[in-house]
Curated annotation (Swiss-Prot):
Annotated residues for binding of substrate: H126, R156, D157, R188, R194, R260, P261, D262, R263, K333
Active site residues according to the UniProt entry: S65 (phosphoserine intermediate)
Any one Gene Ontology BP term: glycolytic process
Pathway note: Carbohydrate degradation; glycolysis; pyruvate from D-glyceraldehyde 3-phosphate: step 3/5
Protein name (Swiss-Prot/TrEMBL): 2,3-bisphosphoglycerate-independent phosphoglycerate mutase
Family classification: Belongs to the BPG-independent phosphoglycerate mutase family.
EC class name: isomerase
GO molecular function: manganese ion binding; phosphoglycerate mutase activity
GO cellular component: cytosol
Record note on quaternary structure: Monomer.
The gene coding this protein: gpmI
Amino acid sequence: MTSTPVSPVVLVILDGWGYQENSDGNAIATANTPIIDSLWTAYPSTFIQTSGKAVGLPAGQMGNSEVGHLNLGAGRTVPQELVRIADAIEDGSLATNPALDKVCKQVSQASTKLHLIGLCSKGGVHAHSDHLLALLKLAKEHNISQVCIHAILDGRDTPPKSAKDEILRLQKQIAHIGVGQIVTLSGRYFAMDRDRRWDRIQQAYDVMVNDQVAVPRDWSPLDAITDAYDHKTTDEFLPPTRIAPGAIEAGDGVIFFNFRPDRARQLTQAFVDPKFDGFEREQVKPLHFVTFTQYDSDLPTDVAFKPQNLDNILGEIVANHGLKQLRLAETEKYAHVTYFFNGGIEDPLPGEDRILVPSPMVSTYDQDPPMSAAKVTEEAIAALDKRIYSLMVINYANTDMVGHTGMMDATIQAVETVDGCLGKLLNQVINVGGTLLITADHGNAERMWDETGNPWTAHTTNPVPFILVEGEGRKIPAHGTDVQLRADGRLADIAPTILDILQLPKPEEMTGSTLIQAAGFEVRQNKSPVRIHR
């Protein structure tokens, strides 16, 4: 007995595809995008918000992929870790946080070293430098004399050469608080790799655990940064460098203060995973290792801010109704359509299939702007042919990953690649009667340089498009051809919209609302639409 072919709802997330009217330095507006341009004109479309309070971040804070996918899958505005930690600092509860209090007491009593590892940045995407300052004050309160800072430089979620200002600010606070020393520097390209490029992680790890690395006399963090700039190396790519003695040794305590897991996981594995095989190393133990948030439930670390429980997320509702779903992305965004979209759940839900397409092995993605978009599209078309999935979630990484390089021409090529792939995907969605939803998790490629003409490599606070291409096999009930979309939407509204199209009930935990406006007519028993006068 054959099952009835399914007409799916296909959610396509164009990572980093934002909107702004100004076309100057705008890779999306400059690129030739006939597919998405025609869809925007021909089908119901609107803009939605992906930053600030709309996604659980502080007002004015740019969104990011983790936050975006979390809100997309949860169907509610999820208070983000940046806000939770800032609140703990403000109300004083950081000082009594059990995991932080425990490691500080152990270090203080044993007279060992406390190491603070993390991204020194005001970007607020993976970490925030204010959190580091709060930890220095906490160490001071515990009378810890040896506090070693392993500073990771940003230049991706912040301007490419902003590290000097950040380090100067940190040094002033160190002098004011009276504790702490910067002992190593590393660009995030090395210390925060997430694509299993273990040679990068090893360089950062070796510098942190090895006191034998030669250090020039009177060598300061600013000297190292200046030297990098002189060699045309920006913050993100600064090679791991030892500045002063202070290696991570047995008996020490470590606090990794990045709050976003995906780019902190690999370095943490190198320190704490007894089965680690990314590169040869002698594990430092015993080591009391604390992570700000849960990077991986299998890692043996204490966690300062434990995961929030998100019940009745989109994937669970689909699974609970016995429907199959698919998550598809290349390596760089695979965790986002799986772990983050599922509210921090690692394992697949019942009936959830996953396809991982390897990202190209290049040092920076301006070297290969198409990335693996063609293979992602090929896998999506093959999955559509099966006619078994009620929901498909697909991420195209190009506009974000290439946009982060600050290279305009390469980003234009990335945008055009994705547009071409959308055309192929659209044809197959139409063939199977599915409904296609196109949106983004945050902006990026619409701003490639700043007001002074320098490369802009960070995300933006701009809105993103949302397009609804209604399919014959997945018609929206009671709307006919008169589907209208709200103009005040946010990412949390997309899950309720999908449930609306699938005709599944929205749980009370979902505080988002469907983007589909109430129909201007109703369908009577004779199936003829009757206009409602308002």
